[in-house]
Amino acid sequence: MTMGNTQNWRLEGDYFEGCNCDSICPCIFLQDPDKGHCNVVVGWHIEKGHYDSIQLEGLNVVAVFVAPGNMFTGPKMKAAFYIDKRSSEEQVNALSKIFSGQSGGFFAAAANLIGEALGIKTAPITFEMKGRRRRLRIPEFMELEIEAIKGNNTDIDSLVTNPSFTVAPGYDPIIARSSKNTYRDLGFEWDSSGKNGFYSKFKYGP
């Protein structure tokens, strides 16, 4: 089934990410990654969402970005997306339109940073939140676990305020560190455990 693009869509929920940079990742200030490259895994859990009349609540999406250098000045990134296997065909098509940037909004701007799209596939995605911990898993492909870094006052989240770029515009990312960050698919393989992580709420629209 195919569908046209629409400007009538909204997504909101929770997101988190992990990469191979040390905390904190300099990429959010448009700087070069501290290892010369940045491999990023990003997960979203949609609490509320729709694409026209197609409801998207409760679904998960994962993106993998491989940046061989500064992701803003080039060379451009490679990107792959995984959509929740529980999604119907209509939901897969809707989420593909949104996350590929075809329906405008944040992802349309982010698409300018991508030089090669490695595809979109469905997969069973586990997205878990417990306090200041987050866990993301796709069997056989990837696993990411992060926990917020504690500051002097452990009752307050440690934030990056006023970043130049964030996956969730309008929200200051909470600084975290991964206890596990492994990936193996599409010819890539890495273990970036013990490195940078961020998480926050998100809200997107056209």
PLM-predicted stretches and their roles:
Residues M1-N8, Y204-P206:
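Basic/polar N-terminal segments that are highly enriched at the extreme N-terminus
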Residues G4-Y51:
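N-terminal ordered "arm"
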Residues C19, I24-F29, K35, D52-I54, ...:
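Residues in flexible loops and secondary-structure boundaries
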Residues L30-H37, N70-P75, L118-R137, I174-S178:
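Short, surface-exposed loop and linker segments with low hydrophobicity and enrichment for Pro/Ser/Thr
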Residues G36-F107:
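Aromatic- and glycine-enriched beta-alpha-beta binding-site module
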Residues S53-N60, F81, G115-K121, P163-S164, ...:
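Low-complexity, flexible helical/coil segments
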Residues M77-L159:
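Charged linear interaction tracts used for macromolecular binding and regulation
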Residues I149-P206:
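Extended, charged low-complexity segments
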